[in-house]
Amino acid sequence: MIVRWGLGRLPELLRGLGIDRPFLIASERWTPLGLSGAGRWTEIPSDRIDAIAGDAADADGLLAVGGGSAIDLAKAVSATTGLAVVSVPTTYSGAEWTPSFGVRDPERRMTGGGAGANLAGIVYDPDLTLTLPLEESVGTAMNALAHCAEALYVKTRNAEADVLALEGARTINDTLPRVADFLHDRQARTRLLAGADSAGHALALAGLGLGHAMAQAIGGRYGLPHGALNAICLPAALRFNEPVAGAEIARFGAALETDDPVGRVRELAQLGGFERLRDLGVPEEDLPALAEAAAGRAGAKANPRPASAGEIEELLRSIW
């Protein structure tokens, strides 16, 4: 993966990859950037993958500008067409680092997913995050923090991912409170984006755990923000995994400068007002079905402690 900083580096990156006619996938809000190419798709999210692939028939690459929804959409098109993806992330979601993706309809409900995207490059520019609202800033940063935590204890963890996860956790812990208080602080935004970069790279190397499995199951059903759900689900997942991954979770806590990582994660989540699933409108009567769905996801299977649907339901009730 080629990573560059500053939107001004984008033309050079595209040329280096041999992309002369990129197809742009970005919502209307990014029109003022003046990016152009072989066409553009602005309906985000969307599950019209075949239509987008048809519109991109004359393109020699895909350029995604936006958060996880825009980048996931580009990855879905890439998996269909083989076109390389260059991402310009405007949130802290980390979607730019993994070839897997979810497909959502315009109401943000999950309608499919897969893997196999051809990822080629990333351009980070903190200026594009300066208008990100508080809830989305905190939510996507908490998603990045969950990437760090889970990379440290999933079954597929490794030494390289550990280093990146700890660095990402330290940076997010240090800078998220500042960003929450001063949304237009460019220096803090830059550091937080760097922390999310480390977190996303750790995710790509190690994978996801139970917290993400729960968040994905809930978000896919109701179209709820993935970051907000991770902010709520991560403390429960940490608590569940402590009996078998206590040392790894303690290392995560050290990166957060605390001996109570569960409490610190809750504190950071509260910066965005994220506390309980009921606050997001999740119906209590759906918890058993959500637990079943979460138990079947890859993150649950990679978790260091096996989790049955019944155990996951108990966790969901504890945060409902």
What function would you assign to each model-found segment?
Residues 1-61, 277:
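ATP/NTP phosphate-donor binding region
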Residues 8-10, 30-32, 69-76, 94-97, ...:
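Short glycine/serine/threonine-rich phosphate/pyrophosphate-binding segments
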